[in-house]
From Swiss-Prot:
GO term, biological process aspect, one: lipopolysaccharide biosynthetic process
Role description: Translocates 4-amino-4-deoxy-L-arabinose-phosphoundecaprenol (alpha-L-Ara4N-phosphoundecaprenol) from the cytoplasmic to the periplasmic side of the inner membrane.
Segments on the Cytoplasmic side according to the record's topology features: 69-76, 122-126
Protein's recorded name: Probable 4-amino-4-deoxy-L-arabinose-phosphoundecaprenol flippase subunit ArnF
Entries under InterPro entries matching the protein: Flippase_ArnF, Small_drug/metabolite_transptr
PANTHER family: 4-AMINO-4-DEOXY-L-ARABINOSE-PHOSPHOUNDECAPRENOL FLIPPASE SUBUNIT ARNF-RELATED, SMR FAMILY PROTON-DEPENDENT DRUG EFFLUX TRANSPORTER SUGE
Sorted UniProt keywords: Cell inner membrane, Cell membrane, Lipid A biosynthesis, Lipid biosynthesis, Lipid metabolism, Lipopolysaccharide biosynthesis, Membrane, Transmembrane, Transmembrane helix, Transport
Pathway: Bacterial outer membrane biogenesis; lipopolysaccharide biosynthesis
Segments in the Periplasmic topological domain: 22-47, 98-100
GO CC, alphabetical: plasma membrane
Length: 126
């Protein structure tokens, strides 16, 4: 069950990253604090993404709490790196994001996957 809690946490934190990114693009910069607060108070575009992005982080932390009670930290922490892969792929494939694809990035993602698989590879006891 700890594995599932960790995967829920990874999914939530990945979605939260994407929501926060879209919110930050839509909201005015914090250097103009008055405009930023007005956007928040009047529920301008970006406000909902900011709210749900922060909520996603909170729910992810709750899932992470349950995951850490049921999984060794070394395995649970390795699963967090899957979030990098999800966010990278979503930023490339989701319409409107226009993130460029680089072969070098794909190599990095492949190394991350290999690392996670190595950590989760069953160890034969003698």
């Amino acid at each position: 069950m700890g594995f599932l809690w960790a995967l829920f946490s990874v999914g939530l934190v990945s979605a939260a990253q994407l929501l926060l990114r879209s919110a930050m693009v839509a909201l005015p910069p914090l250097t103009d604090i008055v405009a930023f607060l007005q956007h928040l108070l009047h529920f301008q575009p970006g406000t909902v993404g900011l709210f749900f992005g922060l909520l996603g982080y909170l729910l992810s932390m709750v899932c992470w709490y349950f995951a850490l009670h049921r999984l060794p930290l070394s395995k649970a922490y390795a699963l967090l790196s899957l979030s990098y892969i999800l966010v990278w792929a979503a930023a490339i494939w989701l319409p409107g994001w226009h993130e460029p694809f680089y072969w070098q990035s794909l190599l990095g993602v492949t190394i991350i996957v290999a690392g996670v698989l190595t950590i989760f590879w069953p160890v034969k006891r003698r």
